Amino acid sequence: MKKLLLSLFFLVQIICANAKDHEDIVTENLNSGGFTLISQSKPVSVIVADNDKKGVLIAVQNLQKDFERVCGKQAQLFNSPTSDTKQCIIVGSLESPYVKQLIKAKQLDEKELKGKVEKYIMTVVSNPLPGVDEALVIAGSDMRGTIYGVYELSEQIGVSPWYDWMDVPVVKHQNLAIKRGSYTAGEPAVRYRGLFLNDEAPCLTTWVKNTFGTEYGGHEFYARVFELILRLRGNYLWPAMWGWSFYADDPLNSPTASDMGVIMGTSHHEPMARNHQEWARHRKEYGEWNYVTNQKVIDEFFREGVRRSKDNEDIITIGMRGDGDTAMGAKEGHDDEFVPNDDETIKLLEKIIKNQRDIIAKETGRPAKERQQLWALYKEVQRYYDKGLKVPDDVIILFSDDNWGDIRRLPSPEELKHKGGFGMYYHVDYVGAPRNSKWLNVTPIQHIWDQLTLTYQYGVDKLWVLNVGDLKPMEYPITFFMDFAWNPKRYDASNLLEHPRKFCAQQFGESQADEAARILNLYSQYAGRVTAEMLDASTYNIETGEFKQVCDEFVRLEADALRQYLSLPENARDAYRQLLLFPIQALANIYDMYYAQAMNHKLYAEGNPEANVWADRVEKCFERDSILCRGYNKEIAGGKWDGMMIQKHIGYTEWNDSFPKDTCPKVMRIEDAEDKVGGYVFKPSAGFVTMDAEHYFTVKNPQDAQWTLIPYMGRTRSGISIQPYSANVAGSSVTYCFDLPEGVDEVEVRVITASTLAFQRKEGHRYTVGLEGKEAVEVNFNGELNEEPENVYRIMYPTVARRVIEKTVKLKIEKAGTQSLVISPLDPGVVLQKIVVDFGGYQPSYLFGKESDCKR
């Protein structure tokens, strides 16, 4: 007894101390005293009874392949001990003859499994079967418990649940051993944990067609989805239903789910195990979806669904909504125009539910309460429940969020007496008002944690289902949702950030985990501010610098992600690109595009020809968006995900993506801006004006020469000079106009030129600076740029190293308003770059300040 208590204590310690499920229990050191899994690239053999559950057998076959991924060779599979199974892995559910034998020999404690739900135990046993010296035993309380134990071992040897759906590389090992001990993840806190593939056109549907050659989701596609769900320790799925019909499209879909161990359901508006498309495709034959006028046909439709699903684990949705996911009585897509009579609808729904349960009882041959059902309180249906609609006591009542991840309703203490329990339908993808959210993952796990913690603490723990759209690119929220549904108590506010770190460690390795998790957390925070579909030029304040701030944050994040991407081994880059680099680049580019549009509109309204530069930037960003998406479709994993990133996301004018294709945001251009010369008038800000030299008001050209723009010269934009340099500069000048407020009686003018040496006039080259109509000040700007002892280190070297010369002149101001500053070269080689007019606010700056606003 004492020995048993000690082993149970150790078991509890394992549960409490380790991550999903157990950290640091596998080693490459075969001399560590552990149980050998791989030795010199040869994996240990596996024994499983041939009469065990099909789902167990399929999982074991996948384990064989996982060993091959890790060491290059498949584990041999046997149905009974042989000479090759002296050391082996034994896998079995509680019904397995081998597990029964171990229990009978008291090598497994039956109490740890019997009556438990989806629990596994993984432990090393000596002499478990005749002819077997030692085995790693994976025993499950039921089929799924066993499957979870098998896939836990797969994770331990280095195969991520996302090896297929995110192309996570498998680390190769020649030797592996598992530490001795008893390991379990216990039972799940939430009984049914699943996904809803929804809003699947055009991305998922196109990818499936490109990958499997079908216009629907067939069993080969769904088998990959089921495997992912099981590797993540989920057990439930609502299949895609916009244009597909899970049950009707491929007769192998449902058996594949049953064989693999996934429980099927239908969405909140698809009652009685029937897909909406099964009705929509036969409307002419069936008539209208109206229970008042067409009950006989609808009841038969319901009977066929239950009859088809009576021998599997499918959870049957009951209730009824309108045709096409609308309120009962409303036309498809016109919920907002419909004014229902709630009292009549409640009576009708109660009648429908009673009739549905009669059908369930008759078709299954047992009381309706013995077949699991759920009723979804989605949108208007919650109102009926609040007004007193009666729900049978054995039915799961499924609450929902507001489609944006905020919980609408939770049960009261009195309602918790409902024996059927409560569920939650949660979204990280949505089609609906105020605007679709389909393109990228924009839901921070902090928000999911907050709302699902609330959900769990209020007793909603029977069923959780997550609307994941096309499944990709929701890899991380799916993982967090499944982990959290298994054990909501595991993460609180103090340790929540451990989850993204552990997730990144599993996908990219320990050495990359901290940085990848930091980038993932920042992306989630930035993306969670506003969806890409809701973002536009007016979202952030451009005047306060807020818009530039958020764009700069994305620029830095993109640089960090690209830096880490380039540091990864080649085989990890596809996974990193899917999880982090693509969404960061895509959203950073969208932010840049709308910021550019905001700047374009602002400068256009001011008459500033720089508006055209920003218009060009909008168009370049729009083009880059298509390049990024094309790269996702055509380049990642050799084009494996072709079609998965074709969702429209630019051009919304209403809630839906009814526009034909992505549309470049509207820009405005100042006509003939490139042909127009001069005319700039600057506005002061914060006590100074900064002007790029090319933005003059007027110029005067000398005979046989002209002022010429030198693009990209200098520290910010460009330079201007008289060309050719050999020309006589007499009579030339350039004038800059700017406004000054009342109360300014003196300004300090800083003229920034290129660091031209005195190549012609040894005493130095000169220009004059003055206000129009006033006496100008002569400036010798390079007379001290020489190698004389008093100049070489003090002036020349520092100046030429900075490549600019800054000279300061003070000028008196007689009146406020528009001023005209005239600069006239007296010698050749003057290259003007920037002019700063300071009247009390300028702070010395290496780039001489951001150019002031102007009009033209």
Region locations from a protein language model:
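Feature activates predominantly on carbohydrate-active enzymes
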Residues: 108-293, 310, 374-378, 388-406, ...
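Structured mid-domain segments that build the active-site/substrate or prosthetic-cofactor binding neighborhood
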Residues: 230, 235-238, 244, 252, ...
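Acidic/histidine-rich, surface-exposed loop or edge segments in extracytoplasmic proteins
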Residues: 38-53, 205-209, 324-338
